[in-house]
Amino acid sequence: MNSSPGPAIALFLMFGGINGDSVVQTEGQVLPSEGDSLIVNCSYETTQYPSLFWYVQYPGEGPQLHLKAMKANDKGRNKGFEAMYRKETTSFHLEKDSVQESDSAVYFCALS
């Protein structure tokens, strides 16, 4: 029996911040196979208590809010993705247990 690997999912990663605050996330192109789990790191530096966001831009579309967390220990969820606002580690990592071809997009982390 001849089986071929499933389609690759392309995730392009960007970041954003304001007023001297900064966000650092996984850079470049990530190519998981369909069904793979995914973690996209997002860490931030700020002197405030920020709200945290993940945005997504699908091919041929403008950016749109993917998920958000307004305070520590909030968990944003959307389309099988989730991200936990972890104040103690200043992180908001985007995770999904099983990526699909329809997840191919540009993802970026931001704070306000």
Swiss-Prot record:
Residues 21-112 form the Ig-like domain. Keywords: Adaptive immunity, Cell membrane, Disulfide bond, Glycoprotein, Immunity, Immunoglobulin domain, Membrane, Receptor, Signal, T cell receptor. Pfam families: V-set. Glycans are attached at residue 41. Disulfide bonds join 42-109. InterPro entries: Ig-like_dom, Ig-like_dom_sf, Ig-like_fold, Ig_V-set, TCR_variable_region. It is found in: Cell membrane. Residues 1-20 form the signal peptide. GO terms for cellular component: T cell receptor complex. It comes from the Eukaryota. The keyword Isomerase does not apply. GO terms for biological process: adaptive immune response. V region of the variable domain of T cell receptor (TR) alpha chain that participates in the antigen recognition. Alpha-beta T cell receptors are antigen specific receptors which are essential to the immune response and are present on the cell surface of T lymphocytes. Recognize peptide-major histocompatibility (MH) (pMH) complexes that are displayed by antigen presenting cells (APC), a prerequisite for efficient T cell adaptive immunity against pathogens. PANTHER family: T CELL RECEPTOR ALPHA VARIABLE 9-1, T-CELL RECEPTOR ALPHA CHAIN V REGION. Alpha-beta TR is a heterodimer composed of an alpha and beta chain; disulfide-linked. The alpha-beta TR is associated with the transmembrane signaling CD3 coreceptor proteins to form the TR-CD3 (TcR or TCR). The assembly of alpha-beta TR heterodimers with CD3 occurs in the endoplasmic reticulum where a single alpha-beta TR heterodimer associates with one CD3D-CD3E heterodimer, one CD3G-CD3E heterodimer and one CD247 homodimer forming a stable octameric structure. CD3D-CD3E and CD3G-CD3E heterodimers preferentially associate with TR alpha and TR beta chains, respectively. This is T cell receptor alpha variable 9-1. The gene is TRAV9-1.
